[in-house]
Amino acid sequence: VAEFTFQYAKKTGARVFGGPKFTVSATYEGMFKEELDAAAARHPEVRYQPLLIDATFALLLQTNGEALVIPALNRDGDLLSDFVLQLYGSIAGSESLVLGFDPVTSEVKTVMAEAPHGTAPALQGKNIANPMAMILAGAALLGYIDTSEARQASRAIYEGVFETIHEGKKTPDLGGQMSTIEFTDEVIRRVVSKLEVWSALG
């Protein structure tokens, strides 16, 4: 996990920000901190700002939108992801990935993509749930398939979703009026259009 943190930060041009509460749990969380420090030494080109997890939460409120990769243990990551998504505006605003690594090379070998939010029985049948997380999960999964077609489809989906949001076409949880089906159809329209244009351009 520590090695992937720095590999992903390098790939995305992000800063590694935060870390475990190693002052309380010197063995379990301390081991993770040691692995992060070792990975930082192997990747000196990646900016590294180690912080205790409580300070990470506090300082996130002061960040300026810079890309961050936040290493966290399971419970902390669960809390952190919900917190960040609420800052964005909706817990349905992002995908979640479970990655399996090659034990020797640390390369990603297995990927499972899902929506990080739970079920919402109160929204069932009302056509108002935000489908972003499920759509983005599909885009993320395509991004790990090693073909140009899959990567292009992944890019088209991401762009289609965020362009739709940027133009103010949102579901009610984000302050908009679009239904689940309307939002999904708008994203599909944009994805199809992008893929047709890119195909024509060669």
Q: What is each stretch, according to the model?
A:
Residues 47-59, 174-175:
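Short, conserved loop-to-beta-strand elements that form functional interface hotspots
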Residues 60-167:
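Glycine-rich phosphate/nucleotide-binding loop
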Residues 26-36, 61-68, 85, 169-170, ...:
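Short glycine/threonine-rich loop-to-helix capping motif typified by GTGT followed
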Residues 147-202:
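Internal helix-turn-beta structural module
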Residues 1-52:
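Glycine-rich phosphate/diphosphate-binding loop of Rossmann-like nucleotide-binding domains
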Residues 53-67, 193-198:
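A glycine- and small/hydrophobic-rich beta-loop-beta segment
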Residues 15-22, 139-143, 173-174:
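Short glycine-rich or small-residue beta-strand-to-loop segments that form or flank ligand, phosphate
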Residues 3-6, 33-37, 132-143, 158, ...:
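Predominant activation on well-ordered alpha-helical scaffold segments within soluble catalytic domains
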